Swiss-Prot record:
It is found in: Cytoplasm. Gene3D superfamilies: Urease accessory protein UreF (1.10.4190.10). It comes from Corynebacterium glutamicum (strain R). Pfam families: UreF (PF01730). The keyword Chaperone applies. Required for maturation of urease via the functional incorporation of the urease nickel metallocenter. InterPro entries: UreF, UreF_sf. It comes from the Bacteria. This is Urease accessory protein UreF. The keyword Chaperone applies.
């Protein structure tokens, strides 16, 4: 058992990591405003779609593709494609902010090949930054299996969104925990599904999700930045 690898995985996939994830709804606030998400069940339905479509074909597939070709040129290509493949401006900006913070945390705490170069390219505005790629750099350097790395990232993302829903909808704390437990099988399925996707599937979207994320940009009263 590699305890250092386990520590890195638990540390960087902690939903409390200061990346700014608490400030983003990734579109569920638009459904709240339209009264289409009013309770735990409706939120869970939305979360399952986000996980199955957007997170699987973008975050999970990007991590898997980097593991297959862990080079600086592939990192650059994936960062550019993730940015270009995200229709909603707020979501692009959210991923860039969180990706920058994740890269800064990794650079500050772990000796990871490519992370300094990645962070410099982000700060020079040559790349945008994405949390899934920053995490993949760290987990790959520690020899952590790609499925474990993807599972940890998706679990952290789902957990952060549930915490935001608890505050925003609002949901009770135990209702949030029930949603988290119910999502475990969907997270596992997303990891498996990402292994079946090809490059042509990269950043596949869902019209409803994409539109709700774009509508949020003009929503007058809101709690979240996306």
């Amino acid at each position: 058992m590699d305890l250092d690898a386990d520590f890195l995985l638990l540390h960087l996939s902690d939903s409390a990591l200061p990346t700014g994830a608490f400030a983003h709804s990734f579109g569920f606030e638009t459904y709240m405003d339209a009264e289409r998400i009013t309770n735990a069940e409706e939120f869970q339905d939305w979360l399952k779609v986000l996980l199955k479509v957007q997170l699987t074909s973008s975050d999970a597939l990007a991590m898997r593709m980097f593991y297959a070709t862990p080079t600086a040129s592939e990192l650059k290509r994936l960062d550019e494609r993730l940015f270009a493949g995200t229709p909603a401006r707020e979501v692009r900006e959210a991923n860039a902010r969180m990706g920058t913070r994740m890269a800064e945390i990794v650079a500050e705490t772990y000796s990871v090949p490519l992370i300094i170069e990645y962070l410099e390219l982000i700060k020079n505005r040559e790349l945008s930054g994405h949390p899934a790629l920053a995490l993949a750099l760290a987990t790959h350097s520690m020899g952590i299996d790609v499925d474990r790395a993807i599972h940890a990232h998706l679990t952290a993302t789902v957990s952060s969104l549930i915490q935001n829903a608890v505050r925003g909808i609002p949901l009770g704390q135990m209702a949030g925990q029930r949603v988290m437990f119910a999502m475990r099988e969907h997270i596992g399925a997303a990891v498996k599904r990402s292994a079946m996707l090809d490059a042509i599937d990269f950043c596949s979207g869902d019209p409803g999700l994409d539109i709700s994320q774009m509508v949020h940009e003009t929503q007058r009263a809101r709690l979240f930045m996306s």
